[in-house]
Amino acid sequence: MIKCFDKNNEVYNLIKNLTERLNVEILEINIFRNKNGGKIQIVLYSKNFSLGIDLMTDLHKMILLILEANLKYSFILELSTPGIDRRIKSDKEFQIFEGKKIKLMLDNEFEEGFILEAKSKSFIFKTDSKELNVFYSDVKKARLV
């Protein structure tokens, strides 16, 4: 399992205060640059409320203002939410998605179950027939269902 994106990321540091105040998690930041500018993709999530189109539009406006005032290159900003079949990409995401149903691959087969509890090095995975303590390092693939 890979770790979360670099917290020294300039974009992350510029928007983290806003997202923390609004109780929104930054799951992923991708930055693509070329000679004409760039594209910034940010994936956001909230456990407490739905990030619907109206809220995402407001977030886009606020984040765009912050980034345009601080970044010295032109860019396109794309915001999205994780989606129903998101591949879980970091240990932190198991904590964020605690209680959610996932498909998990440890050996060569997927099993469906729930993330009961996420800890610092492992999580409890519950299927219909068992509960397992799974270390993040043992996870080959995981995705939301």
UniProtKB/Swiss-Prot annotation:
The function of this protein is: Required for maturation of 30S ribosomal subunits.
Q: Output this protein's name.
A: Ribosome maturation factor RimP
Q: Which family does it belong to?
A: Belongs to the RimP family.
Q: Where in the cell is it found?
A: Cytoplasm
> Which Pfam families does the protein's record reference?
RimP_N (PF02576)
Keywords linked to the UniProt accession: Cytoplasm, Ribosome biogenesis
Q: What does the record list as GO biological process?
A: ribosomal small subunit assembly; translation
Cellular component GO terms held in the UniProt record: cytosol
Query: Can you name the source organism?
Result: Borreliella afzelii (strain PKo) (Borrelia afzelii)
Chief location bin: cytoplasm
Q: What InterPro entries is this protein classified in? A: Ribosome_maturation_RimP, RimP_N, RimP_N_sf
